[in-house]
Structure formats: structure tokens, C-alpha cells
């Protein structure tokens, strides 16, 4: 056995999967046999890795191998950021202001990309903060605040949503610890917090693991939506900040799951 073969056979699962995905950034298709040679693993091991990556939406399994999903490499589902920014703007701004009141000076926080979370920025300008965010507009906005230290994950830029997402397990955020994560949602239902895309869900799960508490910012229209993929059950949410349009049944649903509800003044 050569030194290179020994190194390949000692790869951890995360390293194998990272190399598989890296190969798919270079070529649109890779056979199982090619990937076996690439990472020095058995066919059974490779197929387990491919099954996991396919379930996460990072690749598409086809006859004889895998290919990168074209829809994923070009765009995400859902309204572009520039359009979302101008929908229910008064409610989003009020929700962001109420959510910003939960932030304490000196904290490390995570802000997930989105039109409502973007509106947090002006309310945080006077605080000493360390902020981990995957949002290019949030990065741009907070760059003007010298009191904010910015951390950014590695990955690919999705231009319509203006966010950075990575299919890799190791995106540079593993050592970060935050007291709170602030994020929006496609919808909130009894099933939990829903988002539109599997790659978005995978990236957001990694960000959620970096934070002690999860704060969700949603306007009341999000409670009437039912489409999407479940990111997490309601029990994993600590606080929901919304507007007074939330119905009594939806509020009871959240509070029954142990979620604190904060109503913003619009």
C-alpha cells in the first residue's frame, strides 16, 4: 500500500463527502468507481456517502453514479431577496425592532439571511457584537458599524437570495458559539419551521447548532402557508417575534409547544 492509498483509506466520512462534492464542482457527473478511487473507500461505503448526500440535496443519484443537481447550482426556490424586501415592510421593520431588543451588548449572535432579519441591522449599530451571518446584504450593512465584528461561513453565493450556502459539513463555523440565532421562515405550522430548499435547510441546521437559543422572525402571513420542508419542530424554537395579525389559534399552537411569543407594535 502506498502512502497516498493509506491517507485515502484513513479519511473521515466528512472528508470523503467533501472530496466527492469537490469532484462534482469540477465535473457534472462522477461514477461510483471513480469516487471509490478518489477517496479509497469500498463501494458499500461510497454508496452510503452518496445516499446521505442525496438526502441532503447536495447531489442527485443517477444510473452508474451521481451528478450535481442543476437547479441547486443555479438558484433557490422562493422569492428573490430584492422582491421580499418590499413585501409587508412595516410589519418586518417592527418585528426586527422588537427582536433587536433581545440582543445584549457584547453578545455573539447568528443572523440567517432574509428580508426580515436584514432589517435588524440598523437597530444593532450601537452595540458591541460579534455576528456570524451568511447574508451578503447583512454583511454590507453591518460593515458600516465599527463596533460589529463579522464572521462569514464558506460556500457558494446564491445571487437571487444574496446568501452564502455550502453543501460541505465543514464550512468554517464549527468553532463559533453564539447565544442566539435570528432567522426567518417560509412558514410556521404545527409541523414546525418550514423552508423551501433542502440545501438551505442543511446550511441552516449547521448554523442552528452554533447557537444556544433560536429566535424566529415572521410576519403573521407566514402562519397561513403550508408549503415547504420542515427545518425543525416547534419545540426547538425558543422565541417567535411576529405582528399583531397572528391568530389566537396560531399563538396557542406556539405557546403550547413552549415557544415564547413576542408581539411587535406596527
Feature names for model-found ranges:
Residues 118:
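Glycine-rich SAM-binding Motif I of class I
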Residues 2-33, 37-44, 48-110, 121-126, ...:
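HTH-adjacent hinge/linker in prokaryotic transcriptional regulators
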Residues 113-115:
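Glycine-rich N-terminal segment of FAD-binding domains in flavoprotein oxidoreductases
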Residues 2-22, 29-34, 40-42, 54-55, ...:
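Conserved phosphate- and dinucleotide-binding cores of soluble alpha/beta proteins
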Amino acid at each position: 500500500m502506498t502512502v497516498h492509498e493509506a491517507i485515502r483509506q484513513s479519511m473521515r466520512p466528512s472528508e470523503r463527502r467533501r472530496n466527492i462534492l469537490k469532484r462534482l464542482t469540477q465535473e457534472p457527473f462522477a461514477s461510483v468507481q471513480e469516487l471509490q478511487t478518489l477517496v479509497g473507500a469500498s463501494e458499500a461505503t461510497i454508496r452510503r456517502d452518496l445516499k446521505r448526500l442525496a438526502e441532503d440535496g447536495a447531489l442527485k443519484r443517477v444510473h452508474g453514479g451521481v451528478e450535481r443537481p442543476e437547479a441547486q447550482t443555479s438558484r433557490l426556490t422562493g422569492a428573490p431577496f430584492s422582491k421580499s424586501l418590499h413585501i409587508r415592510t412595516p410589519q418586518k421593520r417592527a418585528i426586527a425592532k422588537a427582536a433587536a431588543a433581545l440582543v445584549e451588548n457584547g453578545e455573539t449572535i447568528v443572523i440567517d439571511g432574509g428580508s426580515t432579519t436584514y432589517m435588524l441591522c440598523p437597530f444593532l449599530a450601537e452595540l458591541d457584537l460579534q455576528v456570524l451571518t451568511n447574508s451578503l446584504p447583512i454583511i454590507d450593512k453591518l460593515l458600516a458599524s465599527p463596533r460589529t465584528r463579522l464572521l462569514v461561513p464558506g460556500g457558494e453565493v446564491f445571487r437571487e437570495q444574496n446568501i452564502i450556502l455550502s453543501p460541505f459539513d465543514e464550512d468554517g463555523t464549527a468553532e463559533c458559539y453564539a447565544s442566539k440565532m435570528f432567522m426567518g421562515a417560509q412558514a410556521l405550522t404545527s409541523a414546525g419551521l418550514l423552508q423551501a430548499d433542502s440545501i438551505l435547510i442543511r446550511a441552516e441546521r449547521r448554523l442552528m447548532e452554533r447557537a444556544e437559543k433560536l429566535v424566529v422572525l415572521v410576519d403573521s402571513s407566514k402562519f397561513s402557508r403550508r408549503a415547504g420542508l420542515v427545518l425543525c419542530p416547534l419545540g426547538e424554537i425558543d422565541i417567535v417575534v411576529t405582528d399583531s395579525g397572528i391568530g389566537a389559534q396560531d399563538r396557542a399552537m406556539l405557546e403550547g409547544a413552549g415557544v415564547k411569543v413576542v408581539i411587535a407594535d406596527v
